[in-house]
Amino acid sequence: MLSHLKAYFTHPRSWAVGLVFVSMGFLFGNWVTLIPYIKAKFDLNDAQLGVLLLSMPFGSTFMNPFATLIINRFGMRHSTIWGMAAMAIAYALPVSSPSIWLTSFSLVVTGMCLATTNVAMNTCVTAIEKHESRNIMSTSHGMFSVGGMVGAALSSFLIGLKTPAIIQVWAISLFVFVLAFAIQKTILSIYEEKNTDNNGSKFIWPTGPLLGMVAISLCINITEGIMADWSAIYVRDIVKANSFFIGWGFAGYALLMATGRFVGDSLVPRFGSSRVLVFGGILATVGILVAVLLPYTYTTILGFGMIGAGVSCGAPILYGSAARIPNMAKGAGLATMNTFSIAGFLAGPAIIGFLSNAFGLTIAISLIALLGLCWATLAAKVKIY
């Protein structure tokens, strides 16, 4: 594993695209830590917050089919650079908006920028893997988690110092904006071939093994959505942690997610995809029980970290498996998997918002335990390619 990571960090193009992943995670980690600020600013109840949080994934879902058109028109490299720059500015807008409606609109815009950058940077990774014979996808996704951890931890520290939220987000956004153009030359050196053939890359209704994989993906992505948007609220309102630690629940989650992704390439050949998924579901279930039954700062960070480790290998395994299903049009499995993954990530926060409003956040967030058991059971039965 160490040799694989050394090769990644000493290869300029891998390292440059890795910084794009880190930056996206860094911005996202900062945002999720400031969600309690948004809730307090507009005096929202949990159900209202859940609806507001639909805005960003709605923007991503809307933009997803157009992202490919943008990349085909302007190229993956320019789309990555300008997408990263636009995303940096967009992430500062929700906290800066004076009204709930402008906040919702700015979250939609942020989601659109995120979707475009996400497709572009993953296309860059695929190009590096194809033309330079390097396996960097799992590590690159791990870099996103590292960025999320650092962003959440830094934001928590700044909150503890009573730094105004607007100053915080604009300073971070400016840093990422400048970084986008600092790595421009290296990103532009990635080999890019013209490819406008999108045959087979359209959504199909899942059946057979793909249906089972989609069900597992829904469980995992609902869990990820819950952790992204509600972990800081849980730490503040239920655990009642010191303000310095508001983002540390998500930071712990992101840290062990990154660790899981960094070691995932060695775990899957040794234990098999199905066993890794089963263990991940069980680990996520145990993790949320630790956080719920022992609602203290350090036990909650530990529990959330276990959830991060549990979900870490889900996306790389399921996306790879969907792409390898025999007798299926090229790209069809991936397109379908991506559609349902976004839907799950979108649905999770809203579901928790309404459940929390009715039964309390502790009971609502315990839904993760059921999701973990569900995907562990399915993973033991579904064929993974």
Where in this protein do the model-derived segments appear?
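Helix-loop-helix hairpin linking two adjacent transmembrane segments in secondary transporters
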Residues: 139-188
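Cytoplasmic helix-loop-helix junction between adjacent transmembrane helices
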Residues: 107-142
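Structural signature of the two symmetry-related core transmembrane helices
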Residues: 78-92, 275-290
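Interfacial helix-cap and linker-helix signal at transmembrane-aqueous boundaries
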Residues: 38-39, 70-71, 157-162, 235-236, ...
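Short amphipathic helix-loop junctions that connect adjacent transmembrane helices
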Residues: 33-47, 229-245
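Helix-breaking motifs and short loop linkers at transmembrane-helix boundaries and internal kinks
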Residues: 43, 75, 96-101, 240, ...
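Conserved MFS/SLC helix-loop-helix module at the cytosolic interface between two early adjacent transmembrane helices
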Residues: 62-101
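Helix-to-loop junctions at the C-terminal end of transmembrane segments
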Residues: 63-76, 260-272, 356-357
